[in-house]
């Protein structure tokens, strides 16, 4: 059986190192002796059930580690289930019982170090490049044994669409990019050209060939196929590493781009500059024959540069972008790849790109900023020195990315330990069940305190285009090293709320100087318009987004301000100012004032706000109303709050819930779920948004109806069912936060119980 291990490094591994003794680290290991016959049967039933129901619920319920933890905690649900017949008859006691059931279940899932584990995956282009990299370097069988490969194959099979292709994410229609990547992944994992479950390979290959073959794969795919030797570098758009040599004042300099754009281009430019091609093995030669419609040697690669499958085209290239690529391809690249510029300029640029790669690797303990970047940087390090320590340090951190669930083994974005824990702690605090949850809060508090970044990036970090990170929290764990504004704000809120509770119950409060560092970080990420960015200050002009080379994602080139980040920061700063009124008083007050103006300015005509990190308008409206309420705005005094409430009330479903399709994100307009369905997590967000705006005092009936849905949807053990994915990034791709289905319904019930029953208010 597979077992989740926590907070462990290998003391004998000189290539593995940590800033806080691996607190929050999650790795999976296969133990052939683990589990009773009954436990193994339960795992197999979870796998079978997912496969049977995958057309209805595309995301896994993340059951394997939950089974493990519940057994280790000897969890048994002793609080009877609650069912509500009529929303008007809902009582404080009903809400309390349901809340206690959910909190007791969720508390049993807390890790020993205080965080809540959980999957953060969903995109179907994460795993294949890792397999490609290890295949090229000759480490595939060393890193992944038979059990690993069995679970990887399970994951690929589980998410193949009926038409034979794979989507951008598990809920998406098939696209060329992910279909090609997953087909090659299957072949490298040992499946034959007509092999795989239910003729998986044959069906996928037919999907590809019916749409013109792999020459129609989008830009990122063309790069990976060129690396593998299934495509030719001359058919890709140029990514000259010489861009690193440009002066930083140039508008398109990588120093100015969004950190994720910069971190992808960094190793890609190195690979492009090297024109690296992996070993041309018999399998690669077979793939050339299988995936092209004409002989490989007869393909006109220059013509294929602009070929893209229509299924992949979310962000078509503007004319100006194609003109730039053509200029670089026709005039610039021939100069840079021939003497003397190949020696004078190209080699210097490659060395500088590698310098940046090593710097980012070291500062993230070889986790890197995310899984896409991780694989590219690891491959670049191997090319630079196949037997070097840099590559070996990368290999040591691969387990940090792997996750196993009933739908198999997948590669995660990187981890959401801190993000999930910050919300979980706030939900449990809101439950007012401290007599039952003191130990849980104490462990969560301890995890948050140990996970704060305590220093800035090493050396002259500004020359490496990095921002301050001291005082921040990451999305995952401290070793990751990348500051995020909303993760920092939510963690800061936790620390401040816990500081108001007895130390003997929740542990000692955080040192004020560390809180000051967090505030300093948050203030540094506010723009002139009052909005708050996610990772770094805005450095690029908005028009640079026209240069986005990735056809299936958007908002990729320039950092920008986000409603959710701004709201989280407002809430954290307001609470901080209440507890530390003499620290940077004027600066913080002005920051809050400007942030509120930003939130008001970002509201849509229908009263909603657009969400960048969750689906979508409901998510951002919850955040925005919370930020406005924290700053003292009310339904009576704020038109923005009144309009936000109107949006939520007019989108409530007949069953009392809310349900928004992920299509709202790419379409940038509110689209309800098909079939008038509700989603419990989105329902929870709407409840909390309405409570922020004082709905309980005006008319609690909409809240009662929504609470009834949540309570009646609770499962026998206190869990909640997995439904549609509600996380998103880069406007067009979903991200599955598996703990959300517990955290937010519990949090909403907690806030509802406090707000909707006047006679029980303290």
From Swiss-Prot:
**GO cellular-component terms in the record?**
lipid droplet
Query: Which PROSITE patterns does the entry link to?
Result: TERPENE_SYNTHASES
Q: What are the protein's GO molecular function terms?
A: beta-amyrin synthase activity
Q: Which InterPro entries did the record assign?
A: SQ_cyclase_C, SQ_cyclase_N, Squalene_cyclase, Terpene_synthase_CS, Terpenoid_cyclase/PrenylTrfase
- Where the PFTB repeats fall, as residue ranges, is 99-141, 149-190, 441-485, 515-560, 592-632, 641-682, 703-744
Q: Name one GO biological process term.
A: triterpenoid biosynthetic process
Give site residues, Transition state stabilizer.
419, 613
Q: Where is the active site?
A: 486 (proton donor)
Name the pathway: Secondary metabolite biosynthesis; terpenoid biosynthesis
Give the catalytic activity. Answer: (S)-2,3-epoxysqualene = beta-amyrin
Q: Which Gene3D superfamilies match?
A: 1.50.10.20
Q: Look up the EC number in the record and give it.
A: 5.4.99.39
Keyword Translocase (UniProt): no
Q: Which Pfam families match?
A: SQHop_cyclase_C (PF13243), SQHop_cyclase_N (PF13249)
Q: Which SUPFAM superfamilies match?
A: Terpenoid cyclases/Protein prenyltransferases (SSF48239)
Family (UniProt): Belongs to the terpene cyclase/mutase family.
Protein name in UniProt: Beta-amyrin synthase 1
Q: Species name for this entry? A: Barbarea vulgaris
Organism taxonomic ancestry: Eukaryota, Viridiplantae, Streptophyta, Embryophyta, Tracheophyta
- In the UniProt record, the gene name given for this protein reads LUP5
């Amino acid at each position: 059986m597979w077992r989740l291990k926590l907070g462990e490094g290998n003391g004998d591994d000189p290539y593995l190192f940590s800033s806080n003794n691996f607190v929050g680290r999650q790795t999976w290991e296969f133990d052939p002796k683990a589990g009773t016959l009954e436990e193994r049967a339960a795992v197999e039933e979870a796998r079978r059930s997912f496969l049977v129901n995958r057309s209805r619920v595309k995301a896994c319920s993340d059951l394997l580690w939950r089974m493990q933890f519940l057994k280790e905690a000897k969890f048994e649900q002793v609080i009877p289930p609650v069912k509500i017949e009529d929303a008007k008859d809902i009582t404080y006691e009903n809400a309390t019982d349901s809340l206690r059931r959910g909190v007791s279940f969720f508390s049993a899932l807390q890790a020993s170090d205080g965080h809540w584990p959980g999957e953060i995956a969903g995109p179907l282009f994460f795993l294949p490049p890792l397999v490609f990299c290890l295949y090229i370097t000759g480490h595939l069988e060393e890193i992944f044994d038979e059990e690993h490969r069995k679970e990887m194959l399970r994951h690929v099979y589980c998410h193949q669409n009926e038409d034979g292709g794979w989507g951008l994410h598990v809920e998406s229609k098939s696209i060329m990019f992910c279909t090609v990547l997953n087909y090659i992944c299957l072949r490298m994992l040992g499946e034959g050209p007509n092999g795989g479950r239910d003729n998986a390979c044959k069906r996928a290959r037919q999907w590809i060939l019916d749409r013109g073959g792999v020459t129609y794969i989008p830009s990122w795919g063309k790069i990976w196929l060129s690396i593998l030797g299934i495509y030719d570098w001359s058919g890709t758009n140029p990514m000259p590493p010489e861009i690193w040599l440009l002066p930083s004042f140039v508008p398109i300099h990588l120093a100015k781009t969004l950190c994720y754009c910069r971190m992808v281009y960094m190793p890609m430019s190195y690979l492009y500059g090297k024109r690296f091609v992996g070993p041309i093995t018999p399998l690669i030669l077979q793939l050339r024959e299988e995936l092209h419609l004409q002989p490989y040697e007869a393909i006109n690669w220059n013509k294929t540069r602009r070929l893209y499958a229509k299924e992949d085209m979310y962000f078509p290239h503007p004319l100006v972008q194609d003109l730039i690529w053509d200029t670089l391809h026709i005039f610039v690249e021939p100069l840079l790849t021939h003497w003397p510029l190949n020696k004078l300029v190209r080699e210097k640029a490659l060395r500088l790109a590698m310098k940046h790669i090593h710097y980012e690797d070291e500062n993230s303990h070889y986790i890197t900023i995310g899984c896409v970047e991780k694989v590219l940087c690891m491959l670049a390090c191997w090319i630079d020195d196949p037997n070097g320590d840099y590559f070996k340090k990368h290999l040591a951190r691969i387990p940090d990315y792997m996750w196993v669930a009933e739908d198999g083994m997948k590669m995660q974005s990187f981890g959401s330990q801190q993000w999930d824990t910050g919300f979980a702690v706030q939900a449990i605090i809101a439950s007012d069940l401290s007599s039952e949850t003191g130990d849980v809060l104490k462990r969560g508090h301890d995890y948050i305190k140990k996970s704060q970044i305590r220093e800035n990036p090493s050396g002259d970090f500004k020359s490496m285009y990095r921002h301050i990170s001291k005082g921040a929290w990451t999305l995952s764990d401290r070793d990751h090293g990348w500051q995020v504004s909303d993760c920092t704000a939510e963690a800061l809120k936790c620390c401040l709320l816990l500081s108001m509770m007895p130390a003997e119950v929740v542990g000692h409060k955080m040192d004020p100087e560390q809180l000051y560092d967090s505030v300093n970080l948050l203030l540094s990420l506010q723009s002139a318009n009052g909005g708050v960015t996610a990772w770094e200050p805005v450095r690029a002009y908005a028009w640079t987004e026209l240069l986005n080379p990735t056809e299936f994602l958007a908002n990729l080139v320039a950092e920008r301000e986000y409603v959710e980040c701004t709201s989280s920061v407002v809430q954290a700063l307001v609470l901080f100012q209440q507890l530390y009124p003499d620290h940077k008083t004027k600066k913080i007050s002005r920051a809050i004032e400007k942030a509120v103006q930003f939130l008001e300015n970002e509201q849509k005509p229908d009263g909603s706000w657009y969400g960048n990190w969750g689906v979508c308008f409901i998510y951002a409206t919850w955040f925005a109303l919370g930020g406005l309420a924290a700053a003292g705005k009310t339904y009576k005094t704020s038109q923005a709050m009144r309009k936000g409430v109107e949006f939520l009330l007019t989108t409530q479903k007949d069953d009392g819930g809310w349900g928004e399709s992920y299509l709202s994100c790419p379409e940038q307009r509110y689209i309800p779920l098909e079939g008038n369905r509700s989603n419990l997590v989105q329902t929870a967000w709407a409840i909390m948004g309405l409570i922020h705006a004082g709905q309980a005092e005006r008319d609690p009936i909409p809240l009662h109806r929504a609470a009834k849905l949540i309570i009646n949807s609770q499962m026998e053990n206190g869990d909640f069912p997995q439904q549609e994915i509600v996380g998103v990034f880069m406007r067009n791709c979903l991200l599955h936060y598996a703990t959300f289905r517990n955290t937010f319904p519990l949090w909403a019930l907690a806030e509802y119980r406090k707000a909707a029953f006047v006679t029980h208010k303290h």
